[in-house]
């Protein structure tokens, strides 16, 4: 017999079909009108949130972040050059959008630490992620055996230690083809320059 979470997971495998698709259509209309970073009372994808460490207890909050898709936009230079050299639209960041969303959530709530995040929707212009944040100084977190380690860390997301950050840094790979990702890309670049 399947658990409730198995049914939720199955429904979210095709988020634009069936009843989840209908919900998504209404949700996206509402989310577009909201601010870029919004605290929400409970996770949209309960199965995913719980798998990533969410618990319905004091000291843990969920924030939905809207982020614009595509590469970074730069301010248009006002001095002369070839139009090819403007580089307004073709600035590809070395971070994935999920990592950027986590950083923005943490900037809004600086007293908290990013535990993890997951995708909840996208359209032609935006992507939405839900970020799980933990209050590192809350007594309920300090006394929780699974989450007490968070109270001993600071600025995980800015150091690329979340799952999305580790992925962008190439740390999902090991062995052949991943020689240059450890200890870090910067360390290997500096070593090469010596």
Swiss-Prot record:
Single Gene Ontology BP annotation: cytoplasmic translation
Bias (Basic residues): 166-175
InterPro entries membership: Rbsml_eL15_core_dom_sf, Ribosomal_eL15, Ribosomal_eL15_arc, Ribosomal_eL15_CS, Ribosomal_uL23/eL15/eS24_sf
A single Gene Ontology CC term: cytosolic large ribosomal subunit
Keywords recorded for this protein, A-Z: Ribonucleoprotein, Ribosomal protein
UniProt superkingdom: Archaea
Location of region: Disordered: 164-194
Gene Ontology MF: a single term: RNA binding
SMART domains (alphabetical): Ribosomal_L15e
Entry's family note: Belongs to the eukaryotic ribosomal protein eL15 family.
Protein name, entry field: Large ribosomal subunit protein eL15
């Amino acid at each position: 017999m399947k658990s409730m979470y198995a049914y939720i997971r199955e429904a979210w495998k095709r988020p634009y079909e069936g009843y989840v698709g209908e919900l998504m259509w209404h949700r996206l209309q509402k989310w577009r009108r909201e601010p870029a970073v919004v605290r929400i009372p409970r996770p949209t994808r309960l199965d995913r949130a719980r798998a990533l460490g969410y618990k319905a207890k004091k000291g843990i909050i969920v924030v939905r972040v809207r982020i614009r898709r595509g590469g970074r936009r730069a301010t248009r230079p006002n001095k002369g050059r070839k139009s090819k050299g403007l580089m307004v639209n073709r600035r590809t960041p070395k971070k994935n959008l999920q990592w950027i969303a986590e950083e923005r959530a943490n900037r809004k709530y600086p007293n908290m630490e990013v535990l993890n995040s997951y995708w909840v929707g996208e359209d032609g212009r935006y992507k939405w992620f839900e970020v799980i944040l933990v209050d590192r100084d809350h007594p309920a977190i300090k006394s929780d055996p699974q989450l007490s380690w968070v109270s001993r860390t600071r600025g995980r997301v800015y150091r690329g230690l979340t799952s999305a950050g580790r992925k962008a840094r190439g740390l999902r790979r090991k062995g052949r083809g991943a020689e240059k990702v450890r200890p870090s890309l910067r360390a290997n670049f500096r070593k090469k320059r010596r």
